[in-house]
Amino acid sequence: SSSCTVYGQPDELPVTEKAPIKKAESPYGNTKQINEEIIRDTVASGAPINAIMLRYFNPIGAHPTALLGELPNGVPQNLIPYLTQTAIGIREKLSVFGDDYDTPDGSCIRDFINVVDLAKAHVIAIRRILEKKQKEKVEVFNIGTGRGVSVLELINGFEKATGVKLNYQIVGRRAGDIEKVWANPDFANKELGWKAVETLEDTCLLYTSPSPRD
């Protein structure tokens, strides 16, 4: 379980697996870079293992039953839980960190990947290792949709999908935030036979659905 944070702020978008690993912008990104180095070194040392590193972009969503999902204790650190807690009144307002980035609406751009699609990528990766189908001892795949969505676009999409008007405010930039990043998932599409299929609209709607999906 790696992360797109290993790329830092990519020079080219969408970012591919061949993009250089730049200095991490956050402690979290640094830990992912260190973890990747440890895995590569372990395999290179002759250990009898192979590895697949899945570089997640921004996971969101819940299982369709609504029985398994993201329900953090305390103040959420991720956008979607904070957004949903604001929608149902747990939080007074949502803070958008910065509207002066070099993006169409000034807010950060991310690649939001549904957690169910992400879980399916894990199953495929594990089977690839067990069935000895790897082409290299260490393989890396971007797990994203290939679609960049800004924070303000996500808020607007949530409001449209749910009919809930969100109370949000623009505040200053947050240290460690990447301006914009989204995946080129072509390698995972081709090699793993995997592709993100869940839409952002359906993902947002599930958060406030009164009953689980079948």
Task: Walk through the language-model features, giving the residues of each.
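Conserved C-terminal active-site "lid" loop/helix of NAD(P)H-dependent oxidoreductases
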Residues: V140, V171-K195
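Generic structural signal for residues in well-ordered beta-strands
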Residues: A51, L94, L166-Y168
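Catalytic helix-loop patch of NAD(P)-dependent Rossmann-fold dehydrogenases
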Residues: T5-N58, L67-N78
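Conserved small/polar residues in nucleotide/adenosyl-binding loops
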Residues: Y207-D214
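Mid/C-terminal beta-alpha module of Rossmann-like enzyme folds, strongest
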Residues: L83, A121-R173
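Alpha-helical substrate-binding/gating segment
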Residues: G61-A62, T84-D102, R110-E139
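Residue-level signal for the nucleotide or nucleotide-sugar donor/cofactor binding architecture
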Residues: S26, G74, N78, R110-V116, ...
